[in-house]
From Swiss-Prot:
The lineage of its organism: Bacteria, Pseudomonadati, Chlorobiota, Chlorobiia, Chlorobiales. Keywords: DNA damage, DNA recombination, DNA repair, Metal-binding, Zinc, Zinc-finger. The keyword Endoplasmic reticulum does not apply. It holds the Pfam family RecR_HhH. It comes from Chlorobium luteolum (strain DSM 273 / BCRC 81028 / 2530). This is Recombination protein RecR. The gene is recR.
Length: 204
């Protein structure tokens, strides 16, 4: 069933393109927007445009940050342990570790994992930028790289590739401990489990 309004259908179609949003949920969201005052709709529209205009990837760690705050607040913080870099798949994983309050090192966001079936190779994610941080021109002083990728086949493949790439550079390569279910995503793991996984990391 389609609505007689092409504008409503266009909005439903736009919402249904979001990850995890089916057609039924998209209809519900469209109806919600329609019932809100114009001011609320304008606020939503401004927020969407603003995030596209202002948010960039940090020039150091590749996490998301505002254009006027680059490098990001984590990279520039004097309270972080600059000898450890935790490698994650996406910005939401950074938030997951930050919520635990236990990890005080730096991060590097790959923005994906190696997945040959999807046509994603090492050059398609932010591996080159990670290696640049370990070069003489990079941050310097890094002694440990923590691999904290999602426990999927693609995550394991990427971890293996990175460990083989990083070990010859003279840094210790570790991996967060098991205890996280295979196939799970880090953003949905509770803080206690994530903290234990980080604390129990082991060499690879």
């Amino acid at each position: 069933m389609q609505y007689s309004s092409s504008s409503i259908e266009a909005l439903i179609d736009a919402f249904s393109r979001l990850p995890g949003v089916g057609r039924k949920t998209a209809r519900r969201l469209a109806m919600y927007v329609l019932q809100q005052p114009r001011l609320e709709a304008e606020r939503l529209a401004r927020a969407l445009i603003d995030v596209k205009d202002r948010v960039i990837r940090c020039s150091v760690c590749q996490n998301v940050t505002d254009r006027e705050e680059d490098p990001c607040s984590i990279c520039t913080s004097q309270g972080r342990d600059r000898t450890v870099i935790c490698v994650v798949e996406s910005p939401v994983d950074v938030l997951a570790f930050e919520k635990t309050g236990h990890y005080r090192g730096l991060y590097h966001v790959l923005h994906g994992v190696i997945s040959p079936l999807d046509g994603v190779g090492p050059d398609d994610i932010k591996i080159r930028e990670l290696l640049g941080r370990l070069s003489p021109e990079g941050i310097g002083g890094v002694r440990e790289i923590v691999l904290a990728l999602n426990p999927t086949i693609e995550g394991e493949t990427t971890s293996l590739y990175l460990s083989r790439l990083l070990k010859p550079l003279g840094v210790e390569v570790t991996k967060i401990a098991r205890g996280i279910p295979v196939g799970a995503e880090l953003e949905f793991i509770d803080e206690a489990t994530l903290s234990r996984a980080m604390e129990g990391r082991s060499a690879v």
